């Protein structure tokens, strides 16, 4: 074997065998292109992607790992979804679930987009992002980058 050499099988691989799968129609109703990654919890994709969000709950795109689907403004497409595997705990993304999928599916997707935000499984999900003026953000950034640069007394001085 040569260092760094890949030895690949000539047999084709089939992923996601035995997992629940479904096909849904989606459309980008926004004015910007949107990309959806292979392992993104589909119910939490960009709000400009129009579809029945409850159909995407607990699912991700059925595409190879590390790839994405791109929709230009106005694009409509049929996508294949596959159930999220493993421990089925969704964390991050748009922070709409943030916990075990099976414990949280209680009309989470009813109502308008504004009503989706809810407490995380730990109860610590922010309800609203604070609005900070640009000048304030700049000052906070300056303070954060000055760590360890303040004048300190020389050794032996008070």
From Swiss-Prot:
Which domain of life does this protein belong to? Answer: Bacteria
Pathway entry: Nitrogen metabolism; urea degradation; CO(2) and NH(3) from urea (urease route): step 1/1
Biological processes, Gene Ontology terms:
urea catabolic process
Listed InterPro entries: Urease_beta-like (IPR002019), Urease_betasu_sf (IPR036461), Urease_subunit (IPR050069)
Q: Does the keyword Flavoprotein apply?
A: no
Main localisation: cytoplasm
**Which keywords fit this entry according to its UniProt record?**
Cytoplasm, Hydrolase
Which residues lie in Basic and acidic residues bias regions? 134-143
- Per the UniProt record, which EC number(s) apply here? 3.5.1.5
Specify where the region named Disordered lies, as residue ranges.
Answer: 113-158
Where it sits in the cell: the answer is: Cytoplasm
List the catalysed reactions. Answer: urea + 2 H2O + H(+) = hydrogencarbonate + 2 NH4(+)
Q: Name one GO cellular component term.
A: urease complex
GO MF annotations in UniProt: urease activity
Segments of skewed composition (Acidic residues): 144-158
Task: State the similarity comment.
Answer: Belongs to the urease beta subunit family.
The subunit field of the Swiss-Prot or TrEMBL record says: Heterotrimer of UreA (gamma), UreB (beta) and UreC (alpha) subunits. Three heterotrimers associate to form the active enzyme.
**What protein name applies here?**
Urease subunit beta
Q: What gene is behind this protein?
A: ureB
């Amino acid at each position: 074997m040569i260092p760094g050499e890949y030895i690949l099988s000539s047999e084709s691989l089939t992923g996601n065998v035995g997992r629940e799968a479904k096909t849904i129609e989606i459309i980008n109703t926004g004015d910007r292109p949107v990309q959806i990654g292979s392992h993104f919890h589909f119910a939490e994709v960009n709000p400009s992607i129009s579809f029945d969000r409850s159909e995407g709950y607990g699912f991700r795109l059925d595409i190879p790992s590390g790839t994405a689907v791109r929709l230009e403004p106005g694009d409509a497409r049929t996508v294949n979804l596959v159930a999220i595997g493993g421990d089925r705990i969704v964390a991050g993304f748009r922070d709409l679930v943030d916990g075990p999928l099976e414990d949280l599916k209680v009309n989470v997707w009813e109502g308008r987009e504004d009503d989706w935000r809810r407490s995380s499984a730990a109860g610590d999900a922010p309800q609203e992002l604070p609005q900070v003026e640009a000048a304030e953000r700049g000052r906070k950034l300056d303070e954060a980058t000055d760590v360890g640069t303040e004048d300190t007394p020389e050794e032996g001085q008070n």
